[in-house]
UniProtKB/Swiss-Prot annotation:
<feature type="binding site">
    <location>
        <position position="84"/>
    </location>
    <ligand>
        <name>Zn(2+) 1</name>
    </ligand>
</feature>
<keyword id="KW-0645">Protease</keyword>
<dbReference type="GO" id="GO:0005829">
    <property type="term" value="C:cytosol"/>
</dbReference>
<keyword id="KW-0963">Cytoplasm</keyword>
<dbReference type="Pfam" id="PF01546">
    <property type="entry name" value="Peptidase_M20"/>
</dbReference>
<feature type="binding site">
    <location>
        <position position="146"/>
    </location>
    <ligand>
        <name>Zn(2+) 2</name>
    </ligand>
</feature>
<keyword id="KW-0482">Metalloprotease</keyword>
<dbReference type="GO" id="GO:0008270">
    <property type="term" value="F:zinc ion binding"/>
</dbReference>
<dbReference type="GO" id="GO:0043171">
    <property type="term" value="P:peptide catabolic process"/>
</dbReference>
<keyword id="KW-0031">Aminopeptidase</keyword>
<feature type="active site">
    <location>
        <position position="86"/>
    </location>
</feature>
<keyword id="KW-0479">Metal-binding</keyword>
<dbReference type="GO" id="GO:0008237">
    <property type="term" value="F:metallopeptidase activity"/>
</dbReference>
<dbReference type="GO" id="GO:0045148">
    <property type="term" value="F:tripeptide aminopeptidase activity"/>
</dbReference>
<feature type="binding site">
    <location>
        <position position="202"/>
    </location>
    <ligand>
        <name>Zn(2+) 1</name>
    </ligand>
</feature>
<dbReference type="Pfam" id="PF07687">
    <property type="entry name" value="M20_dimer"/>
</dbReference>
<feature type="active site" description="Proton acceptor">
    <location>
        <position position="179"/>
    </location>
</feature>
């Protein structure tokens, strides 16, 4: 049996990790994209060594890897645990000032001294958290539970395994940079992470077990115009901004993130930048089904061709499509033990597993593309990438319990 988890230690770890400014930079060409990620990587290296792990290394790309050999000769499996160092560039992660709400009583929570607040009127899940200890923001930054809650949970689980000498299988640990911008995982040293399967600890609500994700691509559409003084523009000016606005109208209005859920894909206009002479539109293309995904990419190509033919532009619009990641299910389905073990571990600690698709991606999607099954486990966090982000300390404790239970590798 696992003795009572020291919530104070778990909380202190988390609060320490979120003090590192590790926000990734979206247009970076090299990893890590921010200095703080390397600083956190070095801190974790130090702590992993103190915990007695072996082969603890930090690469020049800020990828942390470590190994803890099994302490029971009958437990021969090797399981990996993965979390990421960076926070989202969509909301400031600098000078995070967490606030701890003990025994949340329900109702609205004021964030800091400003006008920001979170309310169960908008976030119905808060009703489930009454009586729990919540860590929230001060309303000026994100919290960083994505994914520093996962890091704290992995480190706490390792600490308990070592202190209590709990029988466990071989364990590989990795902390990766720049997950939020899809960059750092490309520098992942697969040769130092050989395992039977792995788990990212990067999910949300307690019970979440995810092993299907979007196929993802990014499309960039460029428009070229011709500027001239507006007083003499008739018959001469070509406004790239106007062209871009017209092109945007060809997309299905209901196939967008704010109108879809479950396994329904979408197009998402993520960025619109430029001026009269040149504009670039950036679209996210997402779908769970591989055939539908291909059709979505073909749709954009066809619309670009039609637009060019219709307008007869001297300099036609340009299209660039880059695949980002693929649905991990094609790999995970061949390693059903990875799902069965997580299911069993959750049930063993009194948690009902909630199998759900990820409407996004994780480092596990990339690892799956390399042949390594890597489902995603909950962290106890909510409202990621926003000033309304929060995490439940009891939810984090649940994650630690599940990690330890999985690493016992019972009945495998």
């Amino acid at each position: 049996m696992i003795s009572q988890i020291d919530k104070t230690e778990l909380l202190e770890r988390f609060l320490h990790y979120v003090s590192f400014h590790t926000q990734s930079k979206p247009h970076a060409k090299h990893s890590p994209s921010s200095v703080g990620q390397m600083k956190l990587a070095m801190q974790l290296q130090k702590e992993l060594i103190q915990l007695g792990l072996e082969n603890v290394e930090v690469s020049k790309y800020a990828v942390v890897t470590a190994f803890l050999p099994a302490n029971d000769p009958n437990l021969t499996k090797t399981i990996g645990l993965v979390a990421h160092l960076d926070t989202s560039p969509q909301c400031s992660g600098k000078n995070v000032r967490p606030e701890v709400i003990e025994e949340y009583r329900g109702g609205d929570i004021a964030l800091g001294i400003g006008e920001e607040f979170i309310s169960p009127v908008y976030y119905s899940f808060m009703q489930k958290l009454v009586g729990q200890t919540l860590i929230v923001t001060d309303g000026t930054t994100l919290l960083g539970a994505d994914n520093k809650a996962g890091i704290a949970e992995i480190m706490t689980a390792l600490s308990i395994l070592q202190k209590e000498n709990i029988p466990h299988c071989n364990i590989r640990v990795a902390f990766t940079p720049d997950e939020e911008i899809g960059l750092g995982i490309h520098y992942f040293p697969m040769e130092k992470f050989s395992c039977d399967w792995a788990y990212t600890i990067d999910g949300g609500e307690v019970g979440e077990l995810e092993y299907e994700n979007f196929n993802a691509a990014t499309a960039k559409v460029r428009f070229f115009g011709r500027n001239i003084h507006t007083g003499y523009a008739k018959g001469k000016m070509l406004n790239a901004l106007t062209l871009a606005c017209e092109f945007q109208q060809v997309f299905p209005v209901d196939e967008v993130p704010e109108k879809t859920d479950g396994k329904v894909g979408f197009y998402h206009l993520e960025d619109f930048s430029g001026d009269i002479e040149q504009v670039e539109l950036t679209y996210l293309i997402r779908d769970f089904d591989e055939q539908n995904f291909a059709q979505r990419k073909a749709f954009i190509k066809n619309q670009v061709e039609k637009f060019n033919a219709k307008k007869g532009l001297k300099k036609p619009i340009e299209l660039e499509i880059q695949d980002s990641y693929q649905n991990m299910y094609d790999v995970v389905k061949n390693v059903p033990q990875s799902i069965e073990l997580a299911d069993r571990a959750m049930k063993a600690v009194g948690i009902k597993p909630n199998h759900k698709p990820i409407r996004g991606g994780t480092d596990g999607a990339f690892l799956a593309s390399k042949g390594l099954a890597c489902p995603n486990i909950f962290t106890g966090g909510y409202n990621f990438h926003s000033k309304h982000e929060l995490v439940s300390l009891q939810g984090m404790e649940n994650t630690v319990q599940v990690i330890i239970e999985m690493l016992k590798c019972k009945d495998l």
